[in-house]
């Protein structure tokens, strides 16, 4: 599995701000989108381009445009929604597919409770977005769904990842590409990434419980 931890100075700076315990919902949303934009830049560096001719202000100009495959962004509900605008700011024409996953309390297995994929998803690059890669169970399930729908080029962007989750995904799907702002130390006894970001979904949606 191709794993890239993007250690750009801007990402390091913004990630440090995201980790603050006293961060506001507004700032968390904005920083999450900004880091996502920087990850998107890296995750799309290998897209093919072709020359095309346009009429410029001083005559015809040869420029380039992205060629070939189109893209669908796949946020995992609910926290993945907080990264969506960060991708759309750079790829406004991308189509959006949505996956909702939850753990079945009886079997402890991850199940899909919501799935809305674009009709031609099999012919698109699928870019999964989710702030946290912790145990890896949800991400493995999401990739399973996309592959079952015919997707062949699957890329994942997460803000922070735990080594345990990376290992789980790599064992199940060694052919995907993973981009993250940070590979953190690991999971604590409660399954939270350390140092991590806390509950990214709560911080994005403003549902953090106050003491």
UniProtKB/Swiss-Prot annotation:
The coenzyme or cofactor needed here is: Mg(2+)
Cofactor note text: Binds 1 Mg(2+) ion per subunit. The magnesium is bound as Mg-PRPP.
Annotated pathway: Pyrimidine metabolism; UMP biosynthesis via salvage pathway; UMP from uracil: step 1/1
Q: Where does 5-phospho-alpha-D-ribose 1-diphosphate bind?
A: 78, 103, 130-138, 199
Signal sequence: where? none
Q: Which SUPFAM superfamilies does the UniProt entry name for this protein?
A: PRTase-like
From the Swiss-Prot or TrEMBL record, what is one GO molecular function term?
magnesium ion binding
Q: What is the activity-regulation note?
A: Allosterically activated by GTP.
Q: Which GO terms describe its biological process?
A: UMP salvage; uracil salvage
Its UniProt entry gives the catalysed reaction(s) as: UMP + diphosphate = 5-phospho-alpha-D-ribose 1-diphosphate + uracil
Sorted alphabetically, which keywords does the UniProt record give?
Allosteric enzyme, Glycosyltransferase, GTP-binding, Magnesium, Nucleotide-binding, Transferase
Q: Known EC number(s)?
A: 2.4.2.9
Residues where uracil binds:
193, 198-200
**Which HAMAP family has this protein been placed in?**
Upp_B
Q: Which PANTHER family match?
A: ADENINE PHOSPHORIBOSYLTRANSFERASE (PTHR32315), URACIL PHOSPHORIBOSYLTRANSFERASE, CHLOROPLASTIC (PTHR32315:SF4)
Query: What family does the Swiss-Prot or TrEMBL record give for this protein?
Result: Belongs to the UPRTase family.
What does this chain do? Answer: Catalyzes the conversion of uracil and 5-phospho-alpha-D-ribose 1-diphosphate (PRPP) to UMP and diphosphate.
The protein, known as: Uracil phosphoribosyltransferase
Q: Which organism is it from?
A: Acinetobacter baumannii (strain AYE)
Taxonomy, top ranks, is: Bacteria, Pseudomonadati, Pseudomonadota, Gammaproteobacteria, Moraxellales
């Amino acid at each position: 599995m191709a794993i890239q931890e993007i250690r750009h100075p801007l990402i390091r700076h913004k990630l440090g701000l995201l980790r603050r315990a006293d961060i506001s919902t507004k700032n968390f949303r904005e920083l999450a989108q900004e880091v996502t934009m920087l990850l998107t830049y890296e995750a799309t560096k290998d897209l093919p381009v072709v020359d095309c001719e346009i009429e410029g202000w001083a005559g015809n100009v040869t420029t380039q445009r992205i060629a070939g495959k189109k893209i669908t962004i796949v946020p995992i509900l609910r926290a993945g929604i907080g990264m969506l605008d960060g991708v759309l700011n750079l790829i406004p024409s991308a189509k959006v597919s949505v996956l909702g996953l939850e753990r079945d309390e009886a079997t402890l297995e991850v199940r899909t409770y919501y799935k809305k994929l674009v009709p031609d998803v099999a012919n698109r690059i699928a870019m999964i977005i989710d702030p946290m890669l912790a145990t890896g169970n949800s991400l493995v399930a999401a990739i399973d769904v996309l592959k079952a729908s015919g997707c062949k080029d699957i890329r994942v962007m997460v803000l922070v990842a735990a080594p345990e989750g990376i290992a789980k995904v790599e064992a199940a799907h060694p052919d995907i590409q993973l981009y993250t702002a940070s590979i953190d130390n690991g999971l604590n006894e409660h399954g939270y990434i350390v140092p991590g970001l806390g509950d990214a979904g709560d911080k994005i949606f403003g549902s953090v419980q106050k003491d």
